A protein has these predicted regions:
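Acidic/His- and Gly-rich active-site-bordering loop/insert found
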Residues: 1-65, 74-90
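Divalent metal-coordination and catalytic microenvironments
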Residues: 39, 69, 115, 167, ...
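Histidine/acidic-residue-rich, glycine-tolerant segments that coordinate divalent metal ions
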Residues: 54-64, 71, 89-209, 214-218, ...
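Active-site-adjacent substrate-binding region
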Residues: 186-193, 262, 267-323
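A conserved active-site cap/scaffold subdomain adjacent to cofactor or substrate pockets
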Residues: 218-240
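Short amphipathic alpha-helices in soluble, non-transmembrane regions
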Residues: 240-247
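Conserved small/polar residues in nucleotide/adenosyl-binding loops
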Residues: 328-335
Length: 335
């Protein structure tokens, strides 16, 4: 963030540091008074060791920009440089460089919500906000957009399955939380495939962590399941959460065990303002080329940029970054 702050200051842009922990905000005033527009980039990396020999390889062991946030920063820094040298425009541009888009450390605040809480959309008050996300799945130099719901909401869930420990040779003397967990995992998938009308909006339940046991011949006392829910409809999300609790508790009870379900909502649905998007499409087509601006479908990835859109009009688009010479998609240690 200090590199960004110094770059903005070198351009004559007024800079505020440490917004939302380590965020940077720059303000550039145009020639005349007018609307205030915010441009936002995320900054955080992922806990992945970079495995390539590129000249922009991470210099920090175990951490890399595997999700493209380094390109977001570079693009916004270049935009600030261009506008600072050609500030013959009406209004004010606010450059927002935000940390913790991937989520703050457990038990801490951060990301877009904390930036908003600390007044990033005030002084001066922002009229509209714009952002982008690069995609390694989409063709390079193409811009993809969609009005209304664009990216999904994200919720993190944990299911603690409690049984009764026993020896692997005498499983009838205990309650096996691994068997219970396997039934819960399968049942959650039927919420999506058999109970959700996916012709309206997509939804996903994915497990990322299964933890349990410490020896091959001992059935553990408990198993922890951790995963994510993605949805583009709040009613559907609420239904999915309700059914997850009902199924987990019911299945565990039927086997003589217990299931404790905890669900924490993360990013909201990224909702692109249709009217503002319609106003901005001519500019996008003018800069990227008419045939390079493409209406696309919604995605089940999530972005805490959604919290800005809960406060003011704005939109986010995707920028294609697929390299036909590299058969990797983000996040990848070779990306």
């Amino acid at each position: 963030s200090e590199v960004i702050a110094k770059h903005l200051e070198s351009l004559g842009i007024t800079v505020t540091r440490n917004v939302g922990v380590n965020g940077v905000v720059g303000i550039l005033e145009g020639k005349n008074k007018g609307k205030v527009v915010a441009l936002r980039s995320d900054m955080d990396a992922l806990p992945i060791t970079e495995n390539n020999n590129l000249n922009y390889q991470s210099v920090n062991d175990g951490v890399m920009h595997a999700c493209g946030h380094d390109s977001h920063m570079s693009i916004l820094m270049a935009t600030a440089e261009i506008l600072s040298k050609n500030n013959d425009f009406n209004g004010t541009v606010k450059f927002i460089f935000q940390g913790a888009e991937e989520g703050p450390p457990p038990g801490e605040e951060g990301g877009a919500r904390m930036m908003i809480k600390e007044g990033v959309l005030e002084n001066p008050e922002v009229d509209a906000i714009f952002g982008l996300h690069i995609s390694s799945l989409l063709p390079m130099n193409k811009v993809f957009y969609k009005p209304k719901g664009f990216f999904a909401s994200s919720s993190r869930f944990t299911v603690k399955v409690i049984g009764s420990q026993s020896h692997g040779g005498t499983p009838w003397l205990g309650v096996d939380p691994i068997v219970i967990s396997s039934q819960i995992i399968n049942s959650f998938q039927t919420i999506i495939s058999r109970e959700s009308n996916l012709t309206n909006e997509p939804a996903v339940i994915s497990f990322g962590i299964i933890e349990g046991g410490n020896r091959f011949n001992i059935i553990p006392n408990e198993v922890n399941l951790v995963g994510t829910i993605r949805s583009l409809d709040y009613e559907m999300r609420d239904y999915i959460k309700q059914r997850m609790i009902e199924l987990a508790e019911g299945i565990a009870k039927s086997y003589g065990g217990t299931a404790i379900v905890d669900i924490v909502d993360g990013a909201d649905i990224t909702y692109n303002d249709p009217e503002l998007m319609e106003q901005m499409l001519p500019s996008l087509k003018s800069s990227a080329g008419k045939n390079n601006v493409i209406l696309n479908s919604a995605k089940t990835i999530a972005e805490d940029y959604a919290y800005y859109l809960n406060e003011i009009p704005g939109f986010m688009f995707e920028l294609g970054g697929y390299n036909i010479c590299l058969l990797y998609t983000s996040p990848s240690p070779r990306d």
